Amino acid sequence: MDTRLINIGFGNIVAAGRVIAIVSPESAPIKRIISDARERGQLVDATYGRRTRAVIITDSGHVILSAIQPETVANRFLTAKVGAPEEPE
C-alpha cells in the first residue's frame, strides 16, 4: 500500500494512496457531495475557518475540505509520487 503522505495545509496530512479525487468546491454536484458527507459524519474540515478551495475525496468515502488550491494539492501529490524512491518488488 502507498504510505506517502500529502500536506493539505496548516499541518494537516492525508495518505496519498487513499485519495481518489481533488476537486474545486464550486459546482452543485460537489456541494451535494459535501452535504451528504456531513450528514453521514464523514466530512473532515481542515480549513481552520478559512474559505474552502479544494475538496479531497478518499476511497473510504470521506470528504476532506482544504483551504489551499486544488492545483497546489495536486502538485504536492505528483511531487510525492515522482520524488519518492521506487519500492523493491
Swiss-Prot record:
Transmembrane segments: none
InterPro entries documented for this protein: RemA-like
Domain of life assignment: Bacteria
The family this protein is said to belong to: Belongs to the RemA family.
Name of the protein in its database record: Putative regulatory protein CYA_2696
